């Protein structure tokens, strides 16, 4: 009851309702909101502080920046969505805010497109070395059937492609990446598809920017070869995987393409099946059957595993269960 009253009090102000309506349509910075609302940064920041403290908004750090979005976990998350639903669609102020929001998103898209064009050649060079992405995605979907995945954590999300693949069927998706430029591209891609149930965060796979959130599926899609300590990255991911949840590593079998190390910063030139399975077991996972997709010259492997233990109780995060044991 107290949290409900706190949330209602926090939202009971015109500007804060406008902020909730805007953040329901995507992740926004203080600068974005200042431009849209036509108010000073200190004033907007004060409103945001109140909404975050009430649990209506999430604040996601990204270096010196912070992005705000409607909360998707916690007791106040449903209240936030409910309040936005009561805001009249035809309100003139809300309509103007949306027009300005579209201008902000258009600028973001231009910046992301520029980054993509500068790097597309490099990405295409790597893609030519292995089987097409569509086949990899089809195999991943077979290992993680969409009807069985409700919440997904994609580590090293890049352009957000895996969130796009699963986004329409899951309740919630979170992507983590260390590249702000990649995150900018991912935000634009998710926004174009209207995937408001998915968002991305800045963070390191060795120290995930999560607290007591949990997921019933975790993916590492062609990213573990960048890790200094792949076993540690898997252990960190398992902290946020529900008991009975599934984790899939998508990466290369051992190869001799040295240019991927020298020109593209790959730390590891593929992984042996046995070593990945040993990392799984050490992290409390039961390995499944490895799927190999031969290419020329690279073979993509999909290593599935299941976290030991019964399915988590509804509403009890994996990290919270771990903290109690």
What are these regions (language model features)?
Residues 2-43, 64-73, 139-141:
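N-terminal helix-turn-helix DNA-binding core of bacterial DNA-binding proteins
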Residues 231-246:
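A short glycine-rich, Lys/Arg-flanked "PGG" loop and its adjoining helix->strand segment in the class I
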Residues 153, 157-207:
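Class I SAM-dependent methyltransferase SAM/SAH-binding core
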Residues 206-218:
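A short acidic, Gly/Pro-enriched loop at the edge of an enzyme's catalytic core
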Residues 216-229:
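A short SAM/SAH-binding and catalytic strip from SAM-dependent methyltransferases
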Residues 131-150:
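Conserved alpha-helix/loop element of class I SAM-dependent methyltransferases that forms part
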Residues 246-304:
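C-terminal alpha-helical "lid/dimerization" subdomain adjacent to the S-adenosyl-L-methionine
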């Amino acid at each position: 009851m107290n949290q409900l009253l706190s949330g209602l009090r926090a939202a009971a102000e015109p500007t804060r309702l406008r902020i909730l309506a805007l953040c329901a349509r995507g992740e926004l910075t203080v600068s974005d909101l200042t431009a849209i609302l036509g108010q000073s940064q200190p004033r907007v920041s004060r409103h945001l502080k109140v909404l975050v403290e009430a649990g209506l908004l999430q604040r996601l750090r990204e270096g010196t920046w912070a992005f705000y979005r409607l909360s998707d976990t916690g007791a106040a998350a449903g209240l936030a969505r409910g309040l936005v639903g009561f805001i009249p669609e035809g309100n003139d102020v809300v309509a103007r805010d949306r027009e300005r929001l579209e201008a902000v998103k258009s600028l973001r898209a231009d910046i992301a497109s520029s980054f993509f064009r500068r790097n597309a050649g490099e990405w295409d060079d790597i893609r030519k070395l292995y089987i097409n992405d569509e086949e990899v995605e089809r195999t991943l979907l077979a290992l993680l059937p969409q009807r069985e995945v409700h919440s997904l954590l994609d580590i090293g999300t890049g352009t957000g492609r895996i969130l796009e693949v699963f986004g329409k069927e899951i309740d919630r998706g979170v992507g983590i990446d260390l590249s702000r430029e990649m995150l900018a591209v991912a935000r634009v891609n998710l926004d174009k598809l209207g995937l408001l149930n998915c968002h991305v965060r800045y963070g390191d796979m060795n120290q995930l920017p999560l607290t007591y959130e949990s997921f019933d599926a975790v993916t590492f899609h062609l990213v573990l070869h960048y890790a200094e300590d792949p076993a540690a990255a898997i252990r960190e991911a398992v902290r946020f995987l529900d008991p009975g949840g599934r984790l899939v590593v998508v990466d290369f079998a051992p190869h001799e393409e040295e240019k991927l190390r020298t020109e593209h910063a790959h730390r590891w030139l593929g992984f042996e099946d046995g070593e990945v399975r040993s990392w799984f077991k050490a992290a409390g996972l039961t390995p499944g059957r490895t799927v190999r997709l031969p290419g020329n010259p690279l073979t993509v492997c999909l290593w599935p595993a299941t976290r030991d233990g019964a399915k988590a109780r509804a509403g009890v995060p994996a990290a919270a269960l771990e903290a109690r044991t």
